[in-house]
Each structure stands twice: as C-alpha cells, then as structure tokens.
Amino acid sequence: MVLQQYRVFFDTSVYIAALLSPGGAAGELVRLAEAGVVRMVVSQEVIIEADRVLAVKFPELVQENRKLWKHLHPEMAPEPSADHLRPFREKLSRGDALILCAACRAKVSAFVTWNTRDFMKHGVSSLVDFPIVVPSDCLALFRKWIEPFLH
C-alpha cells in the first residue's frame, strides 16, 4: 500500500504561531513538514503577509523567517485568476480570499489556520472541498489519515 503525502496549506497565522511557539501544535506541523511527513503548501500571499507582519510586530524574527522559508522549501500554490477569486471575494477580505482560493487551486488535503473568525464563518467552507481546521485538529486529521497504515 502506497502512502500519498498529506498536503497541508499553512495560513499565515499558523506559520507565525510556529515561529513564536515552536512547542505548540503549529510548531509540530512545521516539524512534520521539515521531516517530509507532510507537504507544506503556501501561496505567495502567505509569504508576503508573514514577512509584513513579522517586520512590524517581531522585527527580530525577519531573518529567521526568511531562512526558515528556504529550509522548508514549501510547495507554492498557483496564483488564482480573477475568475477563480470572485466567489471567495463574496465571503472574505481580499487577502484571505487570495489565500483560500490558492489553497483550493492547489487541491490540498487540509487548510490549517488560527484565523477562525474569517475562515470558519458561515458559508466559507462551502467554497472548498477540504477541511478548514486549527493546528490541533489538523494533527488529529493527520493521525486519522495515517491510522490504516499503522496496522
């Protein structure tokens, strides 16, 4: 039985949480990505947003952030076209729409975020065919996904 790689789209909030608290669930997901157990997927918007947030709130982490991106070498989701983006813009801000639409175009296994206010509001999940989860729930999904291969 061949185990396909579990591809997880990391929202900016989860990536930053992993940098700030490597011992948490977000940090564990990054370690799984480092080990090649899961495939980290991001979009150009996530990288730009992370750099912008860190430059303003945690400037001491900007260089570490850039080194980590190079080390992790995430898969880059395709940039969405205006047509792809339209239904996402009806429910989300421009930045969030760009991120979730890119995840959708990348056909990921899960979308992991700490931004529950926006990504988990009514109607957003109907735009995608994958679960939108917080890091601890993503770890539980991963465990459930690999369970059949452990026996």
Regions found by a protein language model. Name each.
Residues M1-Y6, F149-H151:
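Intrinsically disordered, low-complexity and often Lys/Arg-enriched segments
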Residues V8-F10, L20-K57:
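PIN/NYN-family metal-dependent endoribonuclease catalytic core
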Residues S13, A18-L19, R89-L92:
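Short, glycine-rich nucleotide/cofactor-binding loops
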Residues L32, A102, V124:
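Hydrophobic/aromatic ligand-binding patch that stacks against planar heteroaromatic rings
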Residues E45, R66-E90:
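Acidic catalytic patch
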Residues S93-A110:
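Acidic, metal-associated active-site segment
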Residues S109-A110, T116-H151:
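Acidic, PIN/NYN-like endoribonuclease modules and their adjacent C-terminal/linker elements
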